From Swiss-Prot:
Places the protein is found: Cytoplasm, Nucleoid
Pfam families, alphabetized: MraZ
Protein name in the entry: Transcriptional regulator MraZ
UniProt keyword list: Cytoplasm, DNA-binding, Repeat, Transcription, Transcription regulation
Residues annotated as domain SpoVT-AbrB: 5-47, 76-119
Entry-linked CDD domains: MraZ_C (cd16321), MraZ_N (cd16320)
Assembly notes: Forms oligomers.
Stored SUPFAM superfamilies: AbrB/MazE/MraZ-like
Matches recorded under NCBIfam families: division/cell wall cluster transcriptional repressor MraZ
Gene3D superfamilies: Transcriptional regulator MraZ domain (3.40.1550.20)
Biological process according to GO: negative regulation of DNA-templated transcription initiation
Length: 142
């Protein structure tokens, strides 16, 4: 399970350090693609395979399904972790997530998310203000 929050800097070549805690669970390489809310999603290969089966089951006749699958797959890339613990994030993905300098890498159960620090701070601030209401709406019993 991926969990926790880490801040690292992305360099001008698009290289970002993946926290050691996550590297152990992700393996030597994993899939990174566009995520929701303006971040990137990173999936271990076994989790990507599960998602891929769900995407294949979507009806090709539905316009939204085709658009979603295209958008997700067109930017998906197999990222290999180098000897320094870094991955190279392509410009398309950096642009999608507005990654320029300071990044936040977040573990979210079966995936990691990569956020620009600015977007992450905005998201956490807004969510903190409504956390109780969100839990109630989702009927989560702690």
């Amino acid at each position: 399970m991926l969990m926790g929050e880490f801040t690292h800097t992305i360099d001008s070549k698009g290289r970002l350090i993946i926290p050691a805690k996550f590297r152990e669970q992700l393996g030597a390489h994993f899939i990174v693609t566009r995520g929701l809310d303006g971040c990137l999603f990173g999936y271990p290969l076994n989790e990507w395979a599960i998602l891929e089966q769900k995407l294949k089951a979507l009806p090709l006749t539905k316009r939204d399904a085709r658009a979603f699958v295209r958008f997700l797959y067109s930017a998906a890339t197999d990222c290999e972790i180098d000897k320094q613990g870094r991955i190279n994030i392509p410009i398309t993905l950096r642009t999608h997530a507005s990654l320029e300098k300071k990044c936040v890498i977040v573990g979210v159960s079966n995936r990691l998310e990569i956020w620009s620090a600015e977007r992450w701070n905005k998201f956490t601030s807004e969510t903190a203000d409504n956390f109780d209401e969100i839990a109630e709406d989702l009927n989560i019993d702690f």
